[in-house]
Amino acid sequence: MPQFLATLGTLFNNAGVGDAVGRITSWILPSESLFAAVCVYCLGMALFTLIMGNAFAAFPVMTAAVGWPLLIQHFHGNMAAVFAMGMLAGFCGTLCTPMAANFNLVPAALLELDDSYGPIKAQIPTAVPLLVCTILIMYLCCFPGGLL
């Protein structure tokens, strides 16, 4: 399944979604604000995951738009650390979306819960602080001059 979702993300990227998102972010972002770039990348990963249902599909789009050109090439981030933290940010979106049916809706059906969105409602209080912590850890630890 992850291979198919990654392929879906690649198709979105090849269709120009990554370039369009990159143009929008370069127009909005201050050019020398590392923190803003980290926020856009992590929040974008979470948002695209909410829409597409899985971080594997969101990863190629956000990496082509923000991750590679800004965080790696411009700010010289540690590639493995930045992209691992980006996937974690995407997984925060997975916790909050019914599009990730295999994680959120199927268990509710199998457990015969009264509220099919119960797992999502229970996971949001974890997902939001985890996303904030992911942004802070990436900002503080994944770039030259950071804590690591």
Task: Locate the predicted segments by residue.
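Transmembrane alpha-helix interface/packing and boundary motifs in multi-pass membrane proteins
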Residues: 5, 9, 43-58, 88-95
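Membrane-interface interhelical connector segments
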Residues: 16-35, 74
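Small-residue-rich segments of transmembrane alpha-helices in multi-pass membrane proteins
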Residues: 1-3, 65-75
